Regions:
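FNR/FR-type flavoprotein reductase catalytic core
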Residues: 4, 84-133
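Ferredoxin-reductase
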Residues: 2-95, 112
Length: 133
């Protein structure tokens, strides 16, 4: 993964909280209160952690919300440091470079019936899909 975020902008951690054992959610907002670029359900953002690592995190809020992005990060003791840096070191008010939303997990609007299955932290893109229905 590249260390350079294309079209990056700096967002502020507006609020964070532990939502489950080892999982912390982060609300990212524009420091000036401006609207954020739109995203579609299932999208993710690239984010530079406090330690400098660039990682992808699924957006889990409703795509109609333009005032914030919400991600959830699971602390991974055996990972390469991205999740540890966010979960352990990031504090509300911190500024983080973030790339624009991307989506490789689009839901078909033509589908008549949906069965959404997820486990563990894999629920994050599914939450956005559910909220968009």
């Amino acid at each position: 993964m590249s260390d350079i975020l294309e079209n990056e902008r700096v967002l502020r951690i507006g609020r964070s909280e532990f939502v489950a054992d080892g999982i912390r959610s982060f609300e990212l907002v524009d420091p000036a209160g401006e609207s954020l670029p739109p995203f579609t359900a299932g999208a993710h953002i690239r984010l530079r952690t406090p330690a400098g690592a660039v990682r992808k995190y699924s957006l889990c809020n409703d795509p109609s919300e333009r005032h914030r992005y919400v991600i959830a990060v699971k602390r991974d003791e055996l990972g390469r440091g991205g999740s540890l840096s966010l979960v352990n070191d990031a504090v509300d008010g911190d500024l983080l470079p973030v790339g624009p939303p991307e989506n490789a997990f689009r839901m078909s609007r033509a589908a008549r019936n949906l069965l959404l299955i997820a486990g563990g932290i894999g629920i994050t893109p599914i939450l956005s899909l559910i909220r968009s229905l």
